[in-house]
Amino acid sequence: MEIRRLTYADLPQVIAIERRAFPTPWSLAMFVLELSKASGICLAAFVDDELAGYMICSRYDTVWHIMNIAVDPDRRRHGIASTLLVRLFERVDDPDAQYTLEVRRSNTSAIALYDRFRFRGAGVRRRYYADNGEDALIMWRTPGTLRGTLDDVPGT
């Protein structure tokens, strides 16, 4: 597996995966906007020279917000999302970094993945997903969650 910076040239493949992976996919304009931000980290995972997954992460003040992470449905359960997360943490390279994300409450496999990386649930965004009104679980990974506490998680 090769992990590299996501580029505009990757977007046709990104959109194809996005449409297969999510009931309410991001638009091309949303990806273009995120790629244009100098403060973000956007990663692509390639397997056999084909895009297999990607991650969009933006920095807001002192918090890294994982906005989108997706793996081609045919390539799931092969460690691609885990590798993307590891590479994000390596690139940020700050033991005091805080990360947050939203995930569908029904997406138990994604929640289990984030839990393995010491993200912890710390709130809910009611009716966050437009397609069915499902709530989003807000998860955080902070120095505190790495120690087993929520003492430095905003809002807890």
Label every model-predicted segment.
Residues 92-102, 125:
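Conserved GNAT acetyl-CoA-binding A-motif
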Residues 121-123:
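A secondary-structure capping/hinge motif
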Residues 2-78, 82-94, 143-146, 152-156:
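Acetyl-CoA-dependent GNAT
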Residues 30, 125-126:
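Short, P/G- and charge-enriched loop/turn segments at secondary-structure junctions
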Residues 84, 107-110:
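Conserved short alpha-helix immediately C-terminal to the canonical SAM/SAH-binding motif I
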Residues 104-108, 117, 127-156:
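C-terminal "cap" of GNAT-fold acetyltransferases
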